[in-house]
Design a protein with these regions (language model features):
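Short secondary-structure boundary/capping segments
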Residues: 5-6, 51, 121, 128, ...
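Short-chain dehydrogenase/reductase
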Residues: 60, 136, 154, 170-172
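Flexible, glycine/small-residue-enriched loop-and-beta-strand segment within the central core
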Residues: 65-75, 80-149, 174-189
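C-terminal/domain-terminus segments
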Residues: 151-164
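Acidic, glycine-centered active-site loop in nucleotide-sugar glycosyltransferases
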Residues: 165-167, 172-175
């Protein structure tokens, strides 16, 4: 039988009050507290590398970083996040290389049942977020559960991304929609 953690990261119904999950969340809160009090960027990066599931080199995250578990977050090389990053990682959050995240951005994988009886039972579920390389999120962007974004995507300030999009697009609005395609540069000969 699958553990509540295994159910959670698979996107199945799980019980967030499970003792194992509570212990993992508490360990994450301790790392969160240490990171958010650290003023030395190198020491902060070391905490992130220990806390998150995987990271590339050259990462910089401003304070306040808020996450559920940390171990389900995977970020690539050259990752920058401005102030107040929230990553609720009940399912994996994967972001490719060369990402720039503006202030007050949220990556949210948790979902709750719509049926009130199911919701009141304490069950939750989630869906992963996957983002390709060269992502730029303006301030206040929210990425919702189950979203996949391709490479070279720009999400304009305040965008609420509720569905998946492919490569080379600029998104804006609530719900986010494509407002511009980014031309692909031709190879130089």
């Amino acid at each position: 039988m699958a553990s509540e953690y295994e159910k959670m990261i698979a996107g199945d119904y799980y019980r967030p009050a499970d003792p194992e999950l509570r212990a993992l969340a508490q360990a994450s809160r301790e790392k969160q507290e240490a990171f958010n009090q650290e003023v030395d960027p190198k020491k902060g990066a070391a905490i992130i590398k220990e806390w998150f599931g995987s990271t590339g080199e050259n990462l910089y995250l401003n304070r306040q970083v808020l996450v559920d578990y940390g171990g389900n977050i995977h970020i690539g090389e050259n990752f920058y996040a401005n102030y107040n990053l929230t990553m609720l990682d009940v399912c994996p959050i994967t972001i490719g290389k060369n990402a720039m995240i503006g202030p007050n951005c949220q990556f949210l994988t948790p979902l709750h049942p719509l049926d009130p009886d199911e919701r009141n039972s304490g069950l939750e579920y989630g869906a992963p977020i996957t983002i390709g390389d060269n992502f730029w999120a303006g301030g206040g962007v929210t990425i919702l559960p189950g979203v996949t974004l391709g490479d070279n995507v720009v999400a304009g300030a305040g965008a609420v991304v509720t569905k998946s999009f492919g490569d080379n697009v600029v998104l804006a609005g609530n719900p986010a929609r494509v407002i511009k395609e980014i031309p692909v540069k031709k190879e130089k000969r």
